[in-house]
Amino acid sequence: SCAGGLSGISHIPVTRLEAKGEKLTVKISGLMGGHSGAEIDKNRANANSLLGKFLHGLDAKAGYELISVQGGQKDNAITRESIAELLTVKENVEAVKEYAASMQAAWREEYAGTDEGITVTVTEEGEQDVKVLHPTSKEKVVFFLVNVPYGVQKMSGTIKGLVETSTNIGILKTSENEVLGSSSIRSSVETARDALSDKIEYLTEFLGGEYE
């Protein structure tokens, strides 16, 4: 049966703390993007997925607090640009910039021939008093971004070259008390589509969130 697609929306609740430090905006941009149905098999990067990898890897390089993550307008478009607002101490600013440069180089190599314009920029916003995510909330958000599936999950066993099942984390938004992620889940097989939706639901609920 032809099942088509569905949107799975994850709501991850967050709590905040007052903090003071150097505010940085990290922007991942320059991606090819495309339609999550037509272009999902072309090995293009999704900026929201890259942002998750960036934030997780950064923890080992420089301590930081997370303020917000955002990226994408439509869940059926491969996200071309994603932004994280961070707070760190002055001594760590250079380390964040160095890490951004190294990730940009690594991703351009990883996506050679398919997404070579990936750019990672760090903008200094100066010293600010802001409400950052509680460390537990930050970890949940980063864990969600690293683990929410993206891309081709299965090729068709009967039609050569046809994508059977895929998913795209196309929208990321942060408000005062939640981070929202919206995925476009597609499959020509209804049970496979539902299983993939269930997987994202399980991830969301495990992190204390709600899924619709």
Predicted features and spans:
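Midchain, well-structured core segments that form catalytic/ion-binding scaffolds
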Residues: 1-186
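Short secondary-structure junctions
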Residues: 64-66, 208-212
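Redox- and metal-dependent alpha/beta enzyme cores, enriched for Fe-S-associated oxidoreductases
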Residues: 191-210
